[in-house]
Amino acid sequence: MSTSAGTPTSAHAPLSIAPASTPHQRSLSVKPLAAAPSPAPVTQCSITSKEWIVPPRPKPGRKPATDTPPTKRKAQNRAAQRAFRERRAARVGELEEQIKKIEEENEREEAALKKTIQQQQQQIEEYKSQLLWWKNRCKAVEDELMTEKVAKEDAIKQLERINNSGRTTNNGNSVIGGCERCSSTRCQCIDDAFNIANITQMQTDDPHSKRGRSPSQGATQKRHRSNPEIKTEPEDLETDFTHSFSLRRHSRTGNDATTPILLDPCGFCQDGSPCICAEMAEDQPSDRSNQPSQLTKLPPIQNISQFTPPPSEGDVLSKSATLVSSNKSNPCANGPGTCAQCLADPRSSVFCKSLAASRASTRQEGGCCGGGGGKDGCCKNRSSGSDSSKQATSPITLSCADTFTTLSLHPKFASASNELSNWIPQLHTLPNPQNLNPDRRRDQNLTNRPALEVEAASVMGVLRYFDRRFADSK
């Protein structure tokens, strides 16, 4: 085992120092320093040239790998693990196939649902378009319906106007009101209202009468109470003048003085009472053809101020000052409320009937001449009244139609229409000339007048009554 140090071959040959039991371990070899200068030969020293291989240090905590022969248990474990890995790989493959199938089914269902949704959306769009069309159609039908309604209303209004115009032009005894007791000449409601008002006034005036009543007045009132006034319709008062006119036409060649006088019923004279129109016509038959009407000789209405105080601010006399009665003949030949104005205006008809009823009730209450002992004349002061009437100026009068027109111009006439029984008696009509002689009638200009006229002074008094009565109302 000894080698010489001087031989170069022995210097480069490695020397293994590892034990024989560990052939796999690396040996630590130490190479000689060839480049180093060789030292001077020292005597009695030996230098080894063997290469030593040092094994690597094992890592801490781990056993060193040992090549042990495989045993039966390990072989079984390895086989089991191998089989497990194979089964697991097969299971994974199966699951992947199932997943693919599920995904395909899901895609098919999703495609079907998308197709259904698309169809539903198309149907919704169609339904929306149909709904819009129906809305437009409904709107068009509603417009047509409104047009038809308007046309129907216009036709109904036009028919009503035609019916109303036919009613106004009809001169028959059609009932204007709704009480079924009124005709075109008389209104039972108005007569009853004035009779009740007169009875109440008589009861209140009896205890405070200033003078006693004459026996003739008492007998007259008792007679009127015991025998109620019988009101007949205009048809019962009609008279056939056909033969009279024919006789008058044949006798006109003879003496005019023997010509019979034919009169139309005035409508204000009642059955059993003297008629002012008939008396005036009998007294002066010749004045009717030779002399003009006395109404044209009356002073204008502007001169009312010299008989009555000046009107108040609410009076509307200035508007009606130029109204002069143009009806020189009797416009209400068939009775009160039968003239053209009364037929055209129901308020005028009610006013005319109320005035006629008030005049009739006043005539029943008063004395023999209807004045009641006042300024209109009575039995006791007939002589003095007849003497003074010749010297006095004839009063200014208005026709019934002009009176209504004058009063209706007052701003409070609508409110006053509900209180006719309070102010209608204040309108003074012409005195009842049943007991007047022909000279007095001629002096008082009572010939050739309409059947009913109202004093202008009393009209002014009623206008002032409206101002006082409705001063606070707005």
Swiss-Prot record:
Polar residues: compositionally biased ranges: 1-10, 287-307
Induction remarks: Expression is highly up-regulated during iron starvation.
One term under GO cellular component: RNA polymerase II transcription regulator complex
Gene Ontology molecular functions: DNA-binding transcription activator activity, RNA polymerase II-specific; transcription cis-regulatory region binding
Compartments where found: Nucleus
Gene3D superfamilies xrefs: 1.20.5.170
Record carries keyword Ion transport: no
Role description: Iron regulator crucial for the adaptation to iron starvation and iron excess, but is dispensable for virulence. SreA represses the expression of hapX and the siderophore system during iron sufficient conditions by an iron-sensing mechanism, while hapX represses sreA and activates the siderophore system during iron-limiting conditions, resulting in efficient iron uptake and inhibition of iron-consuming pathways.
Official protein name in the record: bZIP transcription factor hapX
Gene: hapX
